[in-house]
UniProtKB/Swiss-Prot annotation:
Binds 4 Cu cations per monomer. Keywords: Apoplast, Copper, Glycoprotein, Lignin degradation, Metal-binding, Oxidoreductase, Repeat, Secreted, Signal. It comes from Oryza sativa subsp. japonica (Rice). This is Laccase-23. Residues 1-22 form the signal peptide. The lineage of its organism: Eukaryota, Viridiplantae, Streptophyta, Embryophyta, Tracheophyta. GO terms for cellular component: apoplast. Cu cation 1 binds at residues 80, 471. Cu cation 4 binds at residues 468, 531, 536. It is found in: Secreted, Extracellular space, Apoplast. Glycans are attached at residues 76, 187, 241, 298, 312, 327, 365, 368, 378, 388, 430. One of its GO terms (molecular function) is hydroquinone:oxygen oxidoreductase activity. PROSITE patterns: MULTICOPPER_OXIDASE1, MULTICOPPER_OXIDASE2.
Length: 567
C-alpha cells in the first residue's frame, strides 16, 4: 500500500474510532412542584426531578444528549443548554417563542443534540419567564478518553460544581408578573446562594450550608457557574489563590487571582491547591452592583471548605475572605481584562458584517395606561433595548418555525438596524429625555452563512448605566477588547487583541463602556442575543440573528422534530 493510501486508511480508522468512542445519553427531566425550606419558611418551587439545583449532566466531548422534558408543573416551560453550540440543531436551543413554542403543562418534548468541539463547564436552565430561578443545573464536558486537560498541573480530583444563585421569599414568577403588570422594577432577591443554600450569614440557614471536604496538599478543579437571575458576583475563597484555566467552556492561559467575577450565565474553572493550615475556610460571594442608585441584594452567601483536621472543632472560627466594594469597577475590570485564550485565535482575516449595538435601559411613556400600570419613575414603565428596539416575543409561533416555513408575516421582520438610529454621547451624565423611549418590535438581523461578524456592544447611560452580561445563543465569540466611555473606532481598534483573545458565550459590557466581539456565522438558524440579567430581557434587552443555510446538508438547519410543541 502506498503512503497516500496508508494515510487515508489511518484517517478513516481514526474517524471511526472517534465516532465509536462517542456515546448517547438519555435523561428524563420531569418538571414538578417541590416544597423546600429556606430563610425559615417553606415554599413550593418548580424543580427538575424534585432536585434543587437540578441534575448535573456529565458527558465527554463528542457525546450526544437526549433530554425528555415532561412538564408536570403549572407553567409553560422550555429548557436552554447554555453555551452548547447546537450545530444545525437550533430546534433544541430552547428560548421560548424564539426557537420553539413552550412545553405546556401535561406535554413533553425531547431535546436532541451533540456536544462537539467543546470541553469544560456549561449549564442548563429554564428559558421561560423567571423559572430559571429554581430550574437549573450543571453540564460538565470532559475530554474524550485518552486525552487530558491542557492544564499546567493536572488536578488530583474535581469537586462538585459550585452553582451560585438567588432566592426569593415568594414565587419568582409572581415577582416578574407583578413587575410586568405595574411597569415597576421587580423585587430584589432575599438571598444569594451556593448550591441552593444561602449559608451561615442568613437566618435558619447554617445547618444546610454548602460543604466541600478537601485534602491537604491536593490540587482540585473547581467549576463555578453563576446561575443568579439578576446579580453579578464577586467570589473569593479565604486564604487561597485560584488559578483560572477556563471560562465558558473555553480554555484560558493560567491566571492566578484571589478574586473571581462571574456575570449571570458565565462559568469559570479554576485550580486550587489546598496548602493552608488545616481548618475551615469560607467561600463567599456577593454582588458587583455597577448601577448607581439602583436597589440590589447586598447580602453575602457562603460555603465551607473543610480540611477535615481532627482538631478542627465545629465551633472554631471560620476564615472569611475580603471581598471588594459592591461598586468596585476597577476590580471587575482587572479580572476580565486578565483573561487570555490558551491558544492563538483563529480569527477571520476579513469582517463582512460590522455592527454597532447600543445596549441599555430606558422608559416607556404612559400616555394610554392607568396609574396602576405606570409604576416606573415619574409615571413611566421600565424598558430596555438594543439599538433603540425593545424586543417583543411573538406568541402565535416561534421565530424559527416562522422562518423555516417561509412565513414571517405577523411574527417577525428582518430589519433590525445595524447601528443606532441616532448617534449621541452614549455615556453622558444627562442623556436627553427624547432618547429614553425605545420602539417595541420583533426584529431580526439576517446573516449570510459563513460571514465574519464583528459587533461593537456600546453601553448607554440612559436612565442608569450598568454592566450588561450579553449572551449569544448558538455561538462562541472572541472578545477583542473592552473599555470605558464611548467606543472610538480610530483609537480603540488599535487595542484589539488579535493574538490570544478569550473566547466566551457571555461578555460583560462594562458600565458606561464597550466591548467588541467577533465570530463566524457558521451555524444556520435563529439565535437570540440578550442581556443575561433577567430583569433586562424581560424589559426587552434582546435581539436575534437569523443565519441563512449554506450549501448542502451539512450547512443547513436540520428538519424540525416531529414532537416540536405547538403554540
Amino acid at each position: 500500500m502506498g503512503s497516500r493510501g496508508c494515510s487515508c486508511w489511518l484517517l478513516s480508522l481514526a474517524l471511526l474510532c472517534s465516532l465509536a468512542a462517542a456515546k448517547e445519553q438519555y435523561h428524563e427531566f420531569v418538571i414538578r412542584e417541590t416544597t423546600v425550606k429556606r430563610l425559615c419558611k417553606s415554599q413550593s418551587i418548580m424543580t427538575v426531578n424534585g432536585q434543587f439545583p437540578g441534575p448535573t449532566l456529565e458527558i465527554k466531548e463528542g457525546d450526544s444528549l437526549i433530554i425528555n422534558l415532561i412538564n408536570r408543573g403549572r407553567y409553560n416551560v422550555t429548557l436552554h443548554w447554555h453555551g452548547v453550540r447546537q450545530m444545525r440543531t437550533g430546534w433544541s436551543d430552547g428560548p421560548e417563542y424564539v426557537t420553539q413554542c413552550p412545553v405546556r403543562p401535561g406535554q413533553s418534548y425531547r431535546y436532541r443534540f451533540t456536544v462537539a468541539a467543546q470541553e469544560g463547564t456549561l449549564w442548563w436552565h429554564a428559558h421561560s419567564s423567571w423559572l430559571r430561578a429554581t430550574v437549573y443545573g450543571a453540564l460538565l464536558i470532559r475530554p474524550r478518553d485518552g486525552t487530558s486537560y491542557p492544564f499546567h498541573v493536572q488536578p488530583t480530583r474535581e469537586l462538585a460544581p459550585i452553582l451560585l444563585g438567588e432566592w426569593w421569599d415568594m414565587n419568582p414568577v409572581d415577582v416578574v408578573r407583578a413587575a410586568t403588570r405595574t411597569g415597576a422594577a421587580p423585587n430584589i432577591s432575599d438571598a444569594l446562594t451556593v448550591n441552593a443554600q444561602p449559608g451561615d450569614l442568613y437566618s435558619c440557614s447554617s445547618h444546610d450550608t454548602a460543604f466541600f471536604p478537601v485534602t491537604s496538599g491536593e490540587t482540585n478543579l473547581l467549576r463555578f457557574i453563576n446561575a443568579a437571575l439578576n446579580t453579578e458576583l464577586f467570589v473569593s475563597l479565604a486564604g487561597h489563590n485560584m488559578t483560572v484555566v477556563a471560562a465558558d467552556a473555553s480554555y484560558t492561559k493560567p491566571y492566578t487571582t484571589s478574586l473571581l467575577l462571574l456575570a449571570p450565565g458565565q462559568t469559570t474553572d479554576v485550580l486550587v491547591t489546598f496548602d493552608q493550615p488545616p481548618g475551615r475556610y469560607y467561600l463567599a460571594a456577593r454582588a458587583y452592583a455597577s448601577a448607581q442608585g439602583v436597589p440590589f441584594d447586598n447580602t453575602t452567601t457562603t460555603a465551607i471548605f473543610d480540611y477535615g483536621a481532627a482538631n478542627n472543632a465545629s465551633s472554631a472560627a471560620i476564615a472569611m475572605p475580603t471581598l471588594p466594594a459592591y461598586n468596585d469597577t476597577t476590580a471587575a475590570t482587572a479580572f476580565t481584562t486578565n483573561l487570555r485564550g490558551l491558544r492563538k485565535a483563529e480569527l477571520p482575516s476579513r469582517v463582512d458584517e460590522s455592527l454597532f449595538f447600543t445596549v441599555g435601559v430606558g422608559l416607556f411613556n404612559c400616555t394610554n395606561a392607568t396609574a396602576q400600570q405606570c409604576g416606573g419613575p415619574n409615571g413611566t414603565r421600565f424598558a430596555a433595548s438594543i439599538n433603540n428596539v425593545s424586543f417583543v416575543l411573538p406568541s402565535s409561533t416561534s421565530i424559527l418555525q416562522a422562518h423555516h416555513h417561509g412565513a414571517p408575516g405577523g411574527v417577525f421582520t428582518a430589519d433590525f438596524p445595524a447601528s443606532p438610529p441616532v448617534q449621541f454621547d452614549y455615556t453622558a451624565q444627562n442623556v436627553s429625555r427624547a432618547l429614553w423611549q425605545p420602539v417595541p418590535g420583533t426584529k431580526v438581523y439576517k446573516l449570510k452563512y459563513g460571514s465574519a461578524v464583528q459587533v461593537v456592544l456600546q453601553g448607554t447611560n440612559i436612565f442608569a448605566g450598568e454592566n450588561h452580561p450579553i449572551h449569544l445563543h448558538g455561538y462562541d465569540f472572541y472578545i477583542l477588547a473592552e473599555g470605558l466611555g464611548n467606543f472610538d473606532a480610530g483609537a480603540d481598534t488599535a487595542k484589539f487583541n488579535m493574538e490570544d483573545p478569550p473566547m466566551r458565550n457571555t461578555v460583560g459590557v462594562p458600565v458606561n463602556g464597550w466591548a467588541v466581539i467577533r465570530f463566524v456565522a457558521d451555524n444556520p438558524g435563529v439565535w437570540l442575543m440578550h442581556c443575561h440579567l433577567d430583569v433586562h430581557i424581560t424589559w426587552g434587552l434582546a435581539m436575534a440573528f437569523l443565519v441563512d443555510d449554506g450549501v448542502g446538508e451539512l450547512q443547513s438547519l436540520e428538519a424540525p422534530p416531529p414532537d416540536l410543541p405547538l403554540c
